[in-house]
């Protein structure tokens, strides 16, 4: 399973990505494939490793609030150290359902993870470090394997845009360790581009176009290497992405909005804690929750607003005018009292690429826009129809 971070389906053309395109031509292209909402990386890496929505796996965003880890603010799930702390305080329940690594092990099979993405997204693919473990740019698990990995692959290269040196090194790791040494039954390969480049440089930029060319060449190298090893006829290849991508034009933040409108005491106060789009209200105060929802609903850059279901399974939230957590499979013990979405449009950027959201930044993802929701899935191999 090859995850090309942030790969929009419309990036994949014969001209821009000939190797990925050709794989689809000899296999299948899933035109209606979709990301899990919120359309952020660690929510979806958890879904890859569990087959579940956040309502079951418990990773609610790229940043999550768990009082047992930090009572005053949310923490980034991009750092594996934070997730290890969550794993510790929950008795091994960083993800609250069984993972693929565990399921494969119970069947006598091995998982291996090779990733140039964040340590957090890598950890969530195999949090119990089953099979051949994890080789990531920022960490190696089990730690006892690090010296051997560094000896085989050499030092970790400096970060670049596109992040070609790191991506090449991690694919070398897949081949030399995941395939040659462990003979893994299943491998997750996570390539940090085009996301890594598109965030600061934008969709359609020279740099992002170069990133697409680079990752396509690396996919081609991987496929040729498997063929040279005589493994192409017995390997099913899935190329996917964790989310799509949009141009971002927003200038505002939810904490500032709530403070300005008098429903949060200060940016640092704990009466209301904001963790990305999730809002946690002290003691789940229903009046405060309703007041915050009303502020959000009257703000033009805020899109859909979600609250706990009025009744279990209902599409309507408990606060009038909101959708329910159940409608997006987000109801979990770690869920906030409110979840917000940013507004979005079909507007094109200066390079002609459609999809614009009112999140802050140059380009990114996270909303319910079809340009964020619609991700890539291409598959080919002996077990897949042609």
Segments and roles (model prediction):
Residues 31, 38-40, 62-89, 127, ...:
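Secreted, luminal/periplasmic, and some membrane-associated catalytic domains
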Residues 10-59, 63, 110-113:
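Short, structured active-site-proximal loop/turn typified by the sulfatase FGly-forming signature C/S-X-P-X-R
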Residues 352-386:
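Low-complexity, glycine/alanine/valine/leucine- and proline-rich hydrophobic stretches
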Residues 53, 59-202, 297-300, 304, ...:
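His/Asp/Glu-rich, glycine-adjacent segments
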Residues 5-9, 29-30, 36-40, 54-55, ...:
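Solvent-exposed loop/turn segments at secondary-structure junctions
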Residues 1-9, 22-24, 48, 104, ...:
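Beta-strand elements within well-structured catalytic alpha/beta cores of enzymes
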């Amino acid at each position: 399973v090859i995850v090309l971070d942030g790969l929009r389906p419309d990036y994949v053309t014969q001209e821009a990505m000939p190797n990925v395109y050709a794989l689809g031509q000899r296999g299948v292209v899933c035109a209606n494939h979709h990301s899990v909402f919120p359309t952020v990386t660690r929510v979806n890496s958890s879904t890859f490793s569990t087959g579940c929505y956040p309502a079951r796996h418990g990773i609610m965003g790229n940043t999550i609030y768990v009082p047992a880890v930090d009572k005053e603010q949310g923490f980034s799930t991009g750092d594996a150290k934070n997730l290890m702390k969550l794993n510790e305080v929950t008795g091994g329940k960083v993800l609250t359902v069984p993972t693929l690594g565990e399921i494969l092990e119970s069947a006598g099979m091995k998982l291996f993870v090779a990733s140039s993405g964040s340590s957090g997204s890598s950890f969530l693919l195999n949090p119990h470090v089953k099979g051949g473990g994890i080789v990531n740019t920022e960490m190696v698990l089990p730690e006892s394997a690090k010296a051997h990995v560094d000896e085989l692959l050499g030092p970790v290269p400096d970060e670049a845009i596109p992040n070609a040196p790191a991506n090449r090194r991690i694919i070398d790791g897949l081949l030399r360790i995941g395939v040659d040494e462990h003979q893994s039954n299943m491998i997750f390969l996570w390539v940090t581009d085009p996301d890594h480049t598109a965030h600061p440089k934008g969709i359609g930029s020279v740099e992002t176009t170069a990133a697409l060319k680079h990752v396509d060449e690396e996919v081609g190298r991987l496929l040729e290497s498997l063929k040279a090893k005589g493994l192409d006829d017995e390997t099913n290849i899935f190329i996917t992405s964790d989310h799509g991508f949009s141009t971002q034009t927003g200038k505002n933040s939810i904490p500032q909005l709530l403070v300005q409108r008098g429903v949060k005491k200060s940016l640092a106060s704990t009466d209301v804690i904001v963790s990305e789009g999730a809002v946690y209200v002290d003691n789940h105060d229903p009046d405060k929750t309703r007041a915050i929802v009303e502020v959000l609903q009257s703000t033009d850059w805020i899109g859909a607003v979600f609250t706990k279901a009025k009744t279990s399974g209902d599409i309507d939230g408990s606060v009038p005018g909101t959708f329910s957590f159940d409608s997006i499979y987000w109801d979990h013990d770690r869920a906030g009292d409110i979840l917000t979405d940013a507004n979005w449009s079909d507007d094109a950027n200066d390079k002609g690429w459609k999809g614009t959201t009112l999140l802050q930044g140059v380009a990114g993802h996270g909303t319910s826009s079809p340009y964020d929701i619609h991700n890539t899935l291409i598959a080919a191999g002996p077990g897949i129809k042609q």
